A protein has these predicted regions:
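Sec/Tat signal peptide C-region and signal peptidase I cleavage site
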Residues: 14-19
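Short, Lys/Arg-enriched, disordered terminal segments
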Residues: 1-4, 342
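Subset of outer-membrane beta-barrel
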Residues: 20-342
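Sec-dependent N-terminal signal peptides
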Residues: 3-13
Length: 342
């Protein structure tokens, strides 16, 4: 019954292809997909490398949704631009959704300019553009006219014909960031971005079916995070995230804490809890070892979908490494946000 219900819900989406944008619960650990102005916005390092993986709905689907990404960004021309620098980076995302094997591959390049405003604030503007490919294996799909009264049978003939099961398009994003750090124990950061500013067309049909617009609506993203060093052992990080696209929205609020277990800040424990409004609680655990951070989250479903998945929504991990170009950079005191390292 679960599979039948999900199949019926999925079929109308094929016509308009208004698919949900790829996303992670750990939006803060996927900086370049959240806001292109995050490119090179690395408060405590010169460069950053990362990987994300998300597995969703494995409790109710034989083929769960799987999303993965790798990214990297760096600060450049830091010593050549007065009180500013450029950020350059890129991200590759890959997603496989459901039994129809709807596969999405995205490759983006990002650039951002960061300008200090005095000694305690920073303003950033960023832009990215990239190539997106979507393809689908229609042999694994079942359509309404293949329902025999009891079951869907994909061996039955269907009137649905996909004109182009493989589509490509160009996508663009813009964003801004502002950070305020009045002292070594306090840090605030807020950003706003607009994705799909060129509103590319995304459809497996050459002509739009009646009543459908296959252009991707702009997606608006706003976020806020802060960092407060409470002692030499504890740093608190409250965060909030909001996105809206074509009337669909997502809001996440929460808090995590870093606990210094080594004294010098090289080893830290991370724990936190987030809430996606109307959908899920998201507990988080993680560990920092020198410049490597590993974070795991689990979406505990609280919406009506919990009747089908038993509260088991998705699990996700992020692996991030921060680094410096040389030992001198690592020794300098350049962190803009609270740190255990002196």
């Amino acid at each position: 019954m679960k599979i039948l219900l999900l199949g019926c819900l999925a079929m109308p989406a094929l016509a308009g292809l208004h698919a949900q944008d790829l996303h992670f619960s750990q939006w803060f650990n996927s900086p370049l997909t959240t806001n292109p102005a995050n490119t090179g916005f690395i408060p405590d390092a010169d460069y950053r490398l990362g990987a994300n993986y998300r597995n969703q709905w494995s409790s109710i689907m034989s083929e769960p949704y799987k999303t993965m990404s790798i990214f990297g960004d760096a600060q450049v021309f830091r010593n050549r631009i007065q009180s500013g620098w450029l950020g350059l980076g890129g991200v590759i995302m890959h997603d496989v959704a459901g039994s129809g094997n709807l596969t999405t591959t995205e490759v983006y390049g990002s650039i951002a300019y960061h300008q200090m405003l005095g000694y305690s604030s920073l303003l950033t503007a960023g832009f990215n553009t990239g190539w997106v490919n979507k393809r689908i294996n229609s042999a694994n799909l079942k359509f309404p006219d293949q329902f025999d009264g009891k079951f869907f049978d994909n061996q039955l003939p269907t009137s649905v014909v996909l004109d182009q099961p493989n589509v490509n398009f160009l996508d663009m994003q813009v964003g801004m960031n502002y950070a305020y750090f009045p002292n070594e124990k306090t840090y605030f950061n807020a950003g706003f971005s607009v994705q799909h500013i060129n509103q590319p067309r995304e459809s497996f049909f050459i002509a739009n079916p009646a009543g459908f617009d296959s252009h991707i609506s702009p997606r608006y993203i706003a976020f806020f995070n802060a960092s407060f060093k409470r002692s030499d052992l504890v740093i608190l990080n409250p965060m909030a995230y909001y996105t809206n696209q074509a009337g669909a929205y997502e809001a996440v609020v929460g808090l995590n804490a870093q606990y210094n277990i080594s004294g010098d800040g090289d080893e830290q424990l991370i724990g936190g809890l987030y809430y996606r409004v109307g959908d899920a609680f998201i507990p988080m655990v993680g560990f920092v070892y020198h410049n490597i951070r590993l974070v795991f989250t689990y979406d505990v479903t609280t919406s009506s979908l919990s009747n089908y998945n038993g509260n088991r929504g998705a699990w996700e991990f992020a692996l991030i490494q921060n680094g410096f170009y040389n030992q001198y950079n690592g020794d300098r005191h350049q962190s803009l946000c609270p740190s255990f390292r002196q």
